[in-house]
């Protein structure tokens, strides 16, 4: 059986390579940074999401080491069995304070956060209205949910309004958008989205993965840029880009939403907790963000 499947895969891979789409991994022989070593040569690095240069920050490295010394290397458990340390609750509180939200839930990655947010909250009676250029993790999360799907052209508010009109027959409606679209760097028009959400009785979800730490006067993301802190129902994001570039994702927002995700979000329920060292470094990172906006000033 595998011989036929092998031949099929070989042809598919050959087609990918012939189209110039085959992905080769670049092997880095140094810490992540503005300068990296590749094949023994020092190179300028313009392709990482290390927006604030924190991936090799000495304070975060020290915090991670201290966290491992104090709380161990790993958790070997999901959160609700025996995988929740005081560090995890501290980081969740720090994230909520940073974004001006009510509560936070941690995930292994933002892909998990986006993949696990819709199905626990919405049913076939409800509607998801999603930007056409949203991240793949949002697209996959929507596919896993039974809610009716509507799509509007990228940042096209006229099209969004038409989709909202069409979704008025549904029980609950949620508009979903990237804060910053990763492929072109455009910022979503969240002020206009929020106005339409109020007009058509819809909730809003924003993925702040590429905007948190970067957009806004103090790096609080697009909600800060548009003076909408605390007014958006759901925010998702990652610790894997501007916030140090390691691992970890989160959903932060209204308390009841976070409570329901703790009960029913499958990536949260069935994945190991974040490692203590990463959590400790995340706590220190948010402390740095609260102490100064020098990183943002240097970036801009």
Regions picked out by a protein language model, each given a short descriptive name:
Residues 78-84, 93-116:
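Short loop-beta-helix segment that forms the pyridoxal 5′-phosphate
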Residues 150, 154-206:
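Active-site phosphate-binding strand-loop segment of PLP-dependent enzymes
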Residues 218, 224-260:
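Active-site PLP attachment segment
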Residues 10-11, 15-73, 202:
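N-terminal "arm"/small-domain region of PLP-dependent enzymes with the aminotransferase-like
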Residues 117-136:
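Conserved PLP-anchoring active-site segment centered on the Schiff-base-forming lysine
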Residues 285-300:
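Structural signature of PLP-dependent enzymes
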Residues 124, 144-146, 200, 231:
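Short, structured coil segments at secondary-structure junctions
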């Amino acid at each position: 059986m595998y011989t036929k499947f092998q031949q099929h895969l070989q042809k598919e891979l050959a087609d990918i390579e012939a189209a110039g789409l085959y992905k080769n991994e670049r092997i880095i022989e140094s810490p992540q940074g503005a300068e990296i070593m590749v094949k023994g040569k020092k190179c300028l690095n313009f392709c990482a999401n290390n927006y604030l240069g924190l991936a090799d920050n000495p304070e975060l490295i020290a915090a991670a080491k201290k966290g491992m010394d104090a709380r161990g290397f790993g958790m070997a458990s999901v959160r609700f069995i025996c995988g929740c340390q005081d560090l995890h609750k501290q980081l969740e509180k720090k994230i909520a304070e940073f974004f001006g939200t009510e509560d936070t839930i941690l995930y292994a990655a933002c892909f998990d956060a986006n993949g696990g947010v819709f199905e626990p909250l919405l049913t076939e009676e409800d509607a998801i209205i999603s930007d056409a250029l949203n991240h793949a993790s949002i697209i996959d999360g929507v596919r896993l949910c039974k809610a009716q799907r509507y799509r509007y052209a990228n940042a096209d508010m006229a099209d969004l309004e038409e989709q909202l009109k069409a979704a008025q027959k549904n029980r609950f409606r949620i508009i979903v958008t990237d804060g910053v679209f990763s492929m072109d760097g455009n910022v979503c028009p969240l002020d206009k989205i929020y106005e339409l959400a109020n007009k058509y009785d819809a909730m809003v979800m924003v993925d702040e993965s590429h905007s948190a730490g970067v957009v806004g006067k103090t790096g609080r993301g697009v909600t800060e840029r548009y003076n909408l802190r605390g007014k958006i129902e759901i925010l998702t994001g990652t610790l894997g880009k501007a916030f140090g570039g390691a691992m970890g994702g989160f959903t932060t927002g209204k308390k009841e939403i976070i409570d329901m995700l703790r009960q029913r979000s499958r990536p949260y329920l069935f994945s190991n907790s974040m490692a203590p060292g990463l959590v400790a470094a995340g706590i220190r990172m948010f402390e740095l963000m609260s102490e100064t906006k020098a990183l943002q000033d240097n970036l801009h």
